[in-house]
Structure formats: C-alpha cells, structure tokens
Amino acid sequence: MARLMTHYDTYAEYKSYTTPTLAPKHVRRFEREVWGPGAYHADMSVLEIGCGTGLVLANLAAKGVHNLVGIDQDPRLGDVVPEPLRSKFKAVDVWTYLENLSPDLAAIDRIIMFDVLEHFAPTDGQQLLDALRVRLAPDGQIHLKVPNASSPWGQQFQYGDLTHRTAYTPESMRQQAIASGLRCRRIYPQKLGSPARQMWERLVHGFLDRTLTAPPEIWEGNFFALLEDAQQN
C-alpha cells in the first residue's frame, strides 16, 4: 500500500514558496515588530527555528547580524532561501538539531520561532521551550509569534493551516512559559494593514471593549511573545 501523504508533504505547494526580497516596507515592519521590541543588536547570536523562505534571516543580515542560523525541516527551502544566506540554512528538524549541538557551543542570545509553536502539541511545545531555555545566553530571549485564539480575528490564522496543533491565547502562552521554566517578558499584538485600517480597528476594538463583558486582552489576529529564563534576574 502506498504511503498516505501528510499535509507536510504538500506544504511547499500549499505555501507557494518564493525567494523573498527586502522592500523598504518590509524593513520598517521588521524594525517595528521584531528588532525594536526584541532589543536586538548586530553582535548577537540568533537562531531561527522554522525560518521558512528566509525573510527574517534576510532582515537580520541587513541589520548586520552575522552570527545567525536558520533551520527548517523542509529541504526544498534550501533552493528558496536568498542565495547569500544559504550557508546559514540547515534542513533539519529542531529535535535533531538540538541533539547534535555541542554542549560547548556558545549560548544563544535570541531564538526566534514565528508561526512555529502552534504546530506542536502542548506537551511537545513545553518540552521544546524547556530544551531551548537551557541554550539561552544570559539576558537571552525566545521570541515567538502565534495566532491569537482569544480573538475572533485570529481564527483564520489558527484554522487556516491543518498542521496547527495548539491554539494559544496570551494567558495560555503565560501558562506554557511557566511550565517551561520561563516567564513572559512581554506580549504584544502584530499590527497588520495600513495606518488608516489600523485607526478604524482601534475605534472598533475600543467600542467592543466598552460593550462586551469579557473582551480579549489582544484583539489582533496574531501576537508576539518574548520569553526569558524564569531564574534570570
């Protein structure tokens, strides 16, 4: 009997992989959403798990970050990641990558997982975060982005991909962090759309906040989280 294909077998077709190019709007968005909130600087070491086509890697490189690695389990991405960054890309699943890391390897300043943690069941996600925690440098952080299951606007992001295993809210993200020996340094929304649309969203959300008995903490469809070792001062 032929092997039944999984959704990951057809992920490249579903996602329509293309090599990213950096436009000024991409750089501004990266600065606003990632670089500034995460307090990144060029001398940091950065690991991106689930780097996809390499857009975040390209932004980091444009900021002068040289000590960076991007991993993804899909080997087809090796021909899609921007050519100057292909030496930074490794086609490997995260568990294998972590198992093969030398204990003597320098600790990592920032570990990025954008649109990744929701692909793991809750227990697997906890185990992954715990394994990453011990790899963090002093003042290191794990930078996440996930669909926002607490908002009606987040459902299209959560359920638009059948490989998603866990739906996160800001509160359940804090719960996951605690279970992993981490704490949430900051949780903040991903702002999408033009300034005009964002203005209208603020008005609508403000009205709903005053109307509903239990409005969500964050209305936007996705949110970021910055996690740090709970033992860190």
Locations of regions flagged by a protein language model:
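A C-terminal cap/extension of S-adenosyl-L-methionine-dependent methyltransferases
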Residues: 143, 186-233
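A short His-aromatic
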Residues: 119-120
